[in-house]
């Protein structure tokens, strides 16, 4: 197909353009496309492309309009003709990949996304877009961890890529169930979006729903209804004062504070830290792990809290629990090298060698 397009273009160039170079048709196509009159836009862009064999932009716009109409075969033909005009265009190559994805030609899509995302000479913004497309392709193949890393790479390339934050939000909310991270990611996406319809959905539906879910989760914790923050703060202060002089009494103060207010970070953290050394039975270990989880729920951006919790879980032979703590930590800060290194170690301990290699490769990029 592509060879035929190149041959046709060559003949057209030899013949030369007539007095009508398609500029008027292109202008009408632009106006129709802006008004979402897609059928008219297609006809106008098609006419512009036919009249000017070197009009690259008309061919790209024709491909986009056909995509919007769901005419994928026509879109593929249009983008191939655009690439024939400008074989070096990374934008056209990325569009070719996105159209191939819609046509379920995943091999071509994968190759196109890799070509663009790995080309260091290209603008970072374009490479970031290719990374997001690659992540979507990986999600289609249920390669969740690979998609996650691709989205992290997309953000590193362009922190203003709304689509990357948007897809990270969905991953955090729907796959990993990390609503606190999802809230941050959707908020970031909403600040960067230019599509008013999608922005409205995120700001008026998605974000309020997550906030309400987090509020209900906190309110549903045992003891939350009758919490006494003032008494808990006083007991935490007393516990901290006794930490070196009388560790046993200090631990008792933290336990009392935690009972008074399960939503206090200081109380949950103090309880978990003071009991982690002596927790041996399954019941004691579970209690400490719950306290660590309560602590990170209150300070979801504290990498130290996650790592301390994960190390305790590893010491008590709970690597799956450690993996979850660290995965949640990375949802908030995927560029923390210490957390990433511990995550790789934990994955290897779980026998997840392929995943460990994936995250280790990402760590080396930082």
Question: Which residues are covered by each model-predicted region?
Answer:
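Alpha-helical segment of the N-proximal tetratricopeptide repeat
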Residues: 23-54, 64, 68, 230-252, ...
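Structural marker of alpha-solenoid helical repeat scaffolds
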Residues: 51, 85, 119-123, 157, ...
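TPR-adjacent "capping" and linker segments in tetratricopeptide-repeat scaffold/adaptor proteins
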Residues: 17-24, 120-128, 217-234, 296
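Structural signature of tandem alpha-helical TPR/SEL1-like repeats
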Residues: 34-44, 69-81, 103-115, 141-150, ...
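Helix-start (N-cap) detector for alpha-helical repeat units in TPR-like alpha-solenoids
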Residues: 21-25, 56-57, 90-91, 123-128, ...
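Terminal, low-structured helical/coil segments at or just beyond the last alpha-helical repeat
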Residues: 191-248, 341-366
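Canonical tetratricopeptide repeat
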Residues: 27, 61, 95, 126-133, ...
């Amino acid at each position: 197909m592509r060879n035929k397009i190149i041959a046709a273009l060559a003949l057209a160039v030899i013949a030369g353009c007539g007095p009508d170079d398609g500029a008027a048709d292109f202008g009408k196509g632009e106006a129709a496309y802006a008004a979402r009159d897609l059928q008219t836009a297609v006809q106008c862009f098609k006419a512009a492309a036919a009249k000017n064999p070197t009009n690259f932009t008309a061919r790209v716009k024709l491909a986009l309009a056909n995509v919007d109409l769901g005419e994928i075969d026509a879109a593929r033909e249009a983008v191939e003709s655009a690439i024939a005009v400008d074989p070096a265009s990374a934008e056209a190559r990325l569009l070719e990949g996105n159209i191939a994805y819609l046509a379920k030609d995943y091999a071509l899509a994968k190759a196109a996304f890799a070509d663009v995302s790995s080309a260091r000479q290209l603008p970072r913004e374009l490479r970031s877009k290719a990374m997001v497309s690659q992540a979507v392709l990986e999600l289609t193949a249920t390669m969740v961890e690979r998609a996650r890393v691709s989205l992290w790479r997309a953000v590193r390339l362009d922190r203003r890529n709304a689509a990357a934050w948007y897809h990270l939000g969905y991953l955090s909310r729907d796959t990993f169930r990390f609503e606190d991270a999802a809230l941050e990611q959707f908020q970031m996406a909403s600040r960067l979006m230019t599509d008013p319809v999608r922005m409205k959905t995120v700001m008026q539906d998605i974000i309020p729903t997550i906030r309400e879910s987090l509020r209900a989760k906190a309110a549903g914790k045992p003891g939350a209804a009758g919490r006494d923050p003032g008494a808990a703060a006083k007991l935490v202060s007393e516990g901290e004062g006794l930490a070196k002089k009388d560790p046993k009494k200090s631990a008792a103060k933290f336990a009392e504070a935690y009972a008074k207010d399960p939503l206090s970070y200081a109380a949950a953290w103090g309880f978990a830290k003071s009991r982690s050394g002596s927790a041996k039975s399954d019941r004691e270990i579970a209690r400490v792990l719950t306290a660590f989880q309560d602590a990170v729920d209150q300070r979801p951006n504290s990498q130290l809290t996650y790592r301390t919790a994960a190390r305790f879980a590893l010491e008590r032979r709970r690597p799956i629990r450690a993996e979850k703590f660290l995965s949640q930590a990375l949802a908030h800060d995927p560029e923390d090298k210490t957390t990433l290194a511990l995550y790789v170690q934990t994955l290897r301990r779980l026998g997840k060698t392929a995943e460990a290699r994936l995250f280790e490769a990402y760590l080396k990029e930082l």
